[in-house]
Structures are given as C-alpha cells and as structure tokens.
Amino acid sequence: MPAWPEKRNYIGSHAKRIDAPANARQRARLGRLSPKDVPISELGGEKIEAVLTTAPGDGNPIGGIKVVTHDGWFAARPSGTEDVYKIYAESFWDHDHLRRIQQEAQALIAQVLQAAP
C-alpha cells in the first residue's frame, strides 16, 4: 500500500471490470454463494470487513458476492446472457492495489467454482 494514506481522498478511486469464462453450472454456483464460501480473511493486504450477498439498503439478493475492505472491494456475479462471470473491483489507493484485489478475487472465485458440484 502507499506510504501516504491521507492522499487517498485526493487521488480518487481506481476501478475495473473483468470477464472470465464460466459454464452454466459455474454461473449457477456463483449466484448461490454465501459468506461462508469465502475462506479468506484478507483482500489486497487488508482485513475483510464484510462479505455480502444482499444489498445493504433493501436486503435484496445481489446475485453474487461482494467482499469489502476499508480501502477496496470486489463483487463477482454471473452474466445472465453470456458464458462468463464478471468481477467488478475498486481500490481507493492506486492501480497496483486494484490489480492485487483483482488477482486475489480471480483466484478466490476460480477456487470456489472449481469445487462446484
């Protein structure tokens, strides 16, 4: 992480979406994930603060999973129209931190989908 945390508010956030191939079985599994399916305690070098499968405001299912830290997050959800899943990620630090979040998110989702029945 950058040495100057106070600068994060001046730099702004960095975000990106990644698409990855997934068959129908894997997409269905991703849509049914629960917080207990996330076997990690850190993301991007930070403690995970929340693992969400429902929207905080209205409690509706988000159709995937969102993992949140103090300075970043990712959400993964299956596409409804293509044989892919999408990872949305954001870092409040920099592009390197964003890449780390993306890599760890991809590894986690690949691990979970590989175990799909």
Model-derived regions: residue spans:
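Phosphate-binding and adjacent anionic-ligand microenvironments
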Residues: 1-117
